[in-house]
Amino acid sequence: MADLSALKEIATTAEPAAPVHVKKVDAQGRSYATGKRKDAVARVWVKAGSGKITVNGKPFSAYFARPVLQMILQQPIVAAARDGQFDVDATVAGGGLSGQAGAVRHGIAKALTYFEPGLRSVLKRGGFLTRDSRVVERKKYGRAKARRSFQFSKR
C-alpha cells in the first residue's frame, strides 16, 4: 500500500509536460496552414525553396500591387530571418485586398511554425500567430450606421 501512495504523490507533484511542437510536413515536403483576417480565409502551403511566393496562381507582387500589402505578406518570413529559403503557395478568398494580405500573413506564420517549430517563439513575439479578431461592427436599427446617428433637427 505504501508503494501505491508513493506513486500517487509522484503523479500529483509532477509538473505538466511542456507541449512538444512536432514538425508537420506532408508527402511533398510542404506544411499547410489556414490564416484568417476579417472576411478573408487563406490556405497556405510552405516548402523549402528559393523564396517564390504565389497567391491564387499569380506572383504576390502582381496580386497585391500596393507595396504596403506586399510588405505585410513578407513580414513573418523577414522576422524569422528566412527570406529566400521558403516557397509559399497560397489561395485566398473573401474580403478585400487588405484582409486577404493579413490572412495570407497569418497563414504563412502558422505554416512556418509547422515546418520549423523553433521559429514559434520569434513569430509569437512578433504577434504573427495571433488571429486579428477585429471585424466590422454591425449596423444598428434606429441609426444611420453602426454608431452614426441620423441627423438631429431641433425644430
Swiss-Prot record:
GO CC field: cytosolic small ribosomal subunit
PANTHER family, sorted: RIBOSOMAL PROTEIN S9, SMALL RIBOSOMAL SUBUNIT PROTEIN US9M
One BP term from GO: translation
Species per Swiss-Prot/TrEMBL record: Sinorhizobium fredii (strain NBRC 101917 / NGR234)
InterPro entries, A to Z: Ribosomal_Su5_D2-typ_SF, Ribosomal_uS9, Ribosomal_uS9_bac/plastid, Ribosomal_uS9_CS, Ribsml_uS5_D2-typ_fold_subgr
Presence of the UniProt keyword Ribosomal protein in the record: yes
Similarity field: Belongs to the universal ribosomal protein uS9 family.
Gene that encodes the chain: rpsI
UniProt KW keywords: Ribonucleoprotein, Ribosomal protein
Protein name per its UniProtKB record: Small ribosomal subunit protein uS9
Molecular function in Gene Ontology: RNA binding; structural constituent of ribosome
Keyword Cytoplasm tagged: no
UniProt xrefs under Pfam families: Ribosomal_S9 (PF00380)
